[in-house]
């Protein structure tokens, strides 16, 4: 089984949301993600989904990437991918969230800011189920 993963393909990481965490030309990856998915049996989506009361939030980008002292949200970040905002949305041209075979929403809890889709926190104790799902599907390749 081949699984294709669309990793955080959201407007927050593009010039479409310049006040969040824009990556130059980040919005131009859709064609490649769709081509990659055409080679797979299953398509997975990961998505940052942050809370307005997140304890790692700072207003000014100058204050980003500073230690928070929190065990599962180690650094400060400006608001990005806040649920319900434009930055939270998937890029245009991708399937809707309901059309993916499996989805992982990361960072929903205000005290958590994980950097991956397999665990909800930095200590890697709270599993998202992605690894287990891939094992159950007999995944032998991930793209």
Model regions and ranges:
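Alpha-helical scaffold elements lining the catalytic groove of polysaccharide deacetylases
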Residues: 111-136
């Amino acid at each position: 089984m081949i699984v294709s993963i669309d990793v955080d393909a959201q407007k927050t990481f593009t010039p479409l949301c310049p006040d969040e965490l824009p990556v130059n030309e980040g919005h131009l990856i859709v064609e490649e993600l769709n081509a990659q998915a055409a080679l797979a049996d299953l398509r997975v989506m990961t998505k940052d989904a942050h809370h307005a009361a997140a304890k790692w939030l700072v207003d000014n980008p100058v204050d980003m990437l500073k230690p928070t002292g929190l065990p599962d949200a180690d650094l400060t970040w400006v608001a990005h991918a806040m649920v319900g905002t434009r930055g939270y949305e998937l890029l245009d041209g991708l399937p809707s969230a309901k059309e993916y075979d499996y989805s992982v929403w990361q960072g929903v809890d205000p005290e958590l800011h994980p950097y991956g889709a397999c665990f909800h926190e930095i200590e890697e104790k709270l599993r998202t189920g992605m690894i287990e799902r891939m094992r159950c599907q007999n995944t032998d390749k991930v793209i």
